[in-house]
């Protein structure tokens, strides 16, 4: 899995937070502590990745069951680990290009270019997934199947 990149520039904000619970002895008299938190109001990231069927067959033993477990993990990775530091992170779409042969039927970059993400909110900053339109061009080479897992 490659590093994800934001679709649009992101703008971090800094907010001040007050903690009512005392975290150390020197703050006992104050009864609270102040802190700062960096947030990004909204961002949509695109990540791309690869599974080498050839290596799985010859070296790693990575199976179809392992792959299905991986897809399930990607889809649900933030569902059972909510945190204020991550806000409402969630997977929104999972497009898989499945090749008919272990060495592939098409170069990956050509397939990744088939997934397009466009802003629909005009000049306003995006604030939700609804501010984007995701399309998948289904005109793909023979031997490749498009699967939308999410």
Regions found by a protein language model. Give the residues of each.
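Basic polyanion-binding and macromolecular-assembly surfaces
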Residues: 2-150
């Amino acid at each position: 899995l490659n590093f994800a990149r934001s679709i649009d520039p992101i703008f971090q904000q800094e907010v001040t937070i007050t903690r009512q619970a005392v975290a150390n002895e020197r703050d006992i008299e104050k009864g609270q502590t102040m802190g700062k938190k960096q947030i990004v109001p909204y961002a949509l990231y695109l990540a791309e990745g690869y599974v080498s069927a050839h290596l799985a067959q010859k070296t790693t033993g990575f199976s179809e069951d392992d792959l299905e477990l991986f897809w399930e993990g990607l889809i649900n990775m933030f569902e059972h680990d909510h945190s204020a530091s991550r806000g409402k992170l969630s997977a929104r779409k999972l497009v898989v290009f499945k090749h008919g042969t272990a060495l592939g039927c098409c170069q990956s970059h050509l397939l990744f270019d088939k997934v397009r993400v466009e802003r629909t909110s005009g000049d306003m900053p995006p604030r939700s997934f609804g501010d984007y339109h995701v399309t998948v061009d289904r005109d793909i080479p023979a031997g490749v199947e498009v699967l939308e897992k999410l």
